[in-house]
């Protein structure tokens, strides 16, 4: 920088695009093995998908930290009956603590 006031040309030295970058991928894959692996992965995903479909919905609980009163979010996946039990516990003596206060003890 020369002088008391910085100017834009002092900071922009060279704006020349690089055209020499090779964007071609020279990697070669064995296609028959990849297809076999894809089929195995697909078969393994089917039972997991069925389990996900049977699972209960996810609920987001927002409350305040019992120590610093910052926002605490808790994601819960449960049945309606068990969610009511959690609600009763939170309305009672169970209180949530934010991660920052939990590390302070």
Swiss-Prot record:
A motif (Nuclear export signal) lies at residues 83-91. A motif (LXCXE motif) lies at residues 23-27. It holds the Pfam family E7. Residues 1-45 are annotated as: E7 terminal domain. Highly phosphorylated. GO terms for biological process: DNA-templated transcription; symbiont-mediated perturbation of host cell cycle G1/S transition checkpoint; symbiont-mediated suppression of host innate immune response; symbiont-mediated suppression of host type I interferon-mediated signaling pathway. One of its GO terms (cellular component) is host cell nucleus. Its main location: host cell. GO terms for molecular function: DNA binding; DNA-binding transcription factor activity; protein domain specific binding; zinc ion binding. A zinc finger (unnamed) spans 65-101. It comes from the Viruses. It is found in: Host cytoplasm; Host nucleus. Residues 30-53 are annotated as: Disordered. Disulfide bonds: none annotated. Keywords: Activator, DNA-binding, Early protein, G1/S host cell cycle checkpoint dysregulation by virus, Host cytoplasm, Host nucleus, Host-virus interaction, Inhibition of host innate immune response by virus, Inhibition of host interferon signaling pathway by virus, Interferon antiviral system evasion, Metal-binding, Modulation of host cell cycle by virus, Oncogene, Transcription, Transcription regulation, Viral immunoevasion, Zinc, Zinc-finger. Plays a role in viral genome replication by driving entry of quiescent cells into the cell cycle. Stimulation of progression from G1 to S phase allows the virus to efficiently use the cellular DNA replicating machinery to achieve viral genome replication. E7 protein has both transforming and trans-activating activities. Induces the disassembly of the E2F1 transcription factor from RB1, with subsequent transcriptional activation of E2F1-regulated S-phase genes. Interferes with host histone deacetylation mediated by HDAC1 and HDAC2, leading to transcription activation. The E7 terminal domain is an intrinsically disordered domain, whose flexibility and conformational transitions confer target adaptability to the oncoprotein. It allows adaptation to a variety of protein targets and exposes the PEST degradation sequence that regulates its turnover in the cell. Homodimer. Homooligomer. Interacts with host RB1; this interaction induces dissociation of RB1-E2F1 complex thereby disrupting RB1 activity. Interacts with host EP300; this interaction represses EP300 transcriptional activity. Interacts with protein E2; this interaction inhibits E7 oncogenic activity. Interacts with host TMEM173/STING; this interaction impairs the ability of TMEM173/STING to sense cytosolic DNA and promote the production of type I interferon (IFN-alpha and IFN-beta). Belongs to the papillomaviridae E7 protein family. This is Protein E7.
């Amino acid at each position: 920088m020369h002088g008391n006031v910085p100017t834009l040309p002092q900071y922009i030295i060279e704006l020349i695009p690089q055209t020499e970058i090779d964007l071609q991928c020279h990697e070669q894959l064995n296609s028959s093995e990849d297809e076999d692996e894809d089929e195995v992965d697909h078969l393994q995903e089917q039972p997991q998908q069925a389990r996900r479909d049977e699972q209960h919905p996810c609920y987001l609980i927002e409350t305040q930290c019992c120590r610093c009163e910052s926002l605490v979010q808790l994601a819960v996946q449960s049945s309606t009956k068990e969610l009511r039990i959690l609600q009763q516990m939170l309305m009672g003596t169970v209180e949530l603590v934010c991660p920052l206060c939990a590390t302070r003890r």
